[in-house]
Amino acid sequence: MKLRDLVYRLYARRVEGRLDHDAAPKHIGVILDGNRRWAKASGGTTEQGHQAGADKISEMLGWCTETDVEVVTLWMLSTDNLDRPEVELRPLLNIIENTVRGLASDGRWRVHHVGNLDILPARTQTVLKEAEQATHDVDGILVNVAVGYGGRQEIADAVRSLLLEHARKGTSFEELAEILDIDHIAEHLYTRGQPDPDLVIRTSGEQRLSGFMLWQSAHSEYYFCEVFWPAFRKVDFLRALRDYAARHRRYGT
């Protein structure tokens, strides 16, 4: 074992040993950013970058299991990403489909899709639906795979779903306007029934949310990590948890 690897392991163990698992976030959202830049820096192809990022996911979920995280939301494909050239998009969708199948077949995690299924190719829709069905009763971390996801799209879809529900009930616009509140909209989000994210991690050094979980992250803590997603290490994850535990969450008060 190289000296650098030994020092890294000892340091990671030290950071982990000082973590208070009771203070750990229960729901972590992750913006998996930097695959293409990692590939460029490594002299690889864009597809190789996306594959390296996909390979990191199960490793990261293992770290979440070790630290008692209950829900993880992984932003794998945004609505904007669907506008990429077909020569890049189709291989990326193949990687996402294979990754979701792998998460489902692993047997440790319950997979749930968040996003607009209707804007995705039929094959991708099928893979996501089958993964949900196959893992419905798994007693493990709930893994939200955000594919075809956009924060503004989610809110628009929630409002549309709410309006259609009340239209079926015969509720007039005046009646709906009188009773409408935050909870009514929250009940129609992709993540309805789930806790909001306590911590949102974004890799690659970008310090913006880009529309990720706009509604749910109102009181989330954010951690921006300089490394590209494929290079994200356990020690980076542990540092994010350490940083989160050191903060005093005010929830707007």
PLM features: what roles do these ranges have?
Residues 1-253:
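Flexible, compositionally biased loop and terminal segments
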